[in-house]
């Protein structure tokens, strides 16, 4: 066991939950009419040493976004990745995904104990319009597919190989985030993670 001092972040001074990739200037790697590839290389004194590649591609089937993270350091490190797209949401947008349980949000936005039984208002195994309330929950046992369906709009389907999904929304806002993640929030402090 070793102690790692996380890098300072003025936007998340207590936890560094969102890392720092989203705060960096990414470099153009490749560009064409139907795709763009952006690369990032980050090294911190504490041992976080990684590269990332983000590729957006348009096709007849839709938009594909692919995010890859590679640890480049000589010592093992607790790296993880989360992809946080914001989607337009109306009062009629329905969300649907399967999961085996969830972590309710606790104090300081950290998760409480994992729960197998979900209240109906946050169980999206059947498509439904989310309540217009603050939601910030992590789901486990996600099968890697989520749908956002809004009448008279293209259906959004999210497909990912990672086992965790965050759902985030603020009341009275026209967006929702469905965030595939490689790990649960605060995983480094969870038993068995």
List where the protein language model places each region:
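Short solvent-exposed strand-capping/beta-turn motif centered on an Asx-Ser/Thr pair
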Residues: 70-75, 151
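Short coil/turn motifs at secondary-structure junctions
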Residues: 45, 72-74, 86, 90
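Beta-strand-rich recognition/accessory modules
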Residues: 37, 43, 129-193
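Short, well-ordered beta-strand segments enriched in hydrophobic/aromatic residues
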Residues: 54-56, 63-71
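Extended, loop-rich substrate-binding clefts of extracytoplasmic carbohydrate-active enzymes
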Residues: 13-60
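Acidic-aromatic substrate-binding/catalytic surfaces of carbohydrate-active enzymes
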Residues: 1-13, 176
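Active-site/ligand-binding surface loops and adjacent short beta/alpha elements
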Residues: 78, 85-160
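A residue-level signal for conserved active-site and pocket-lining positions in enzyme catalytic cores
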Residues: 28, 84, 178
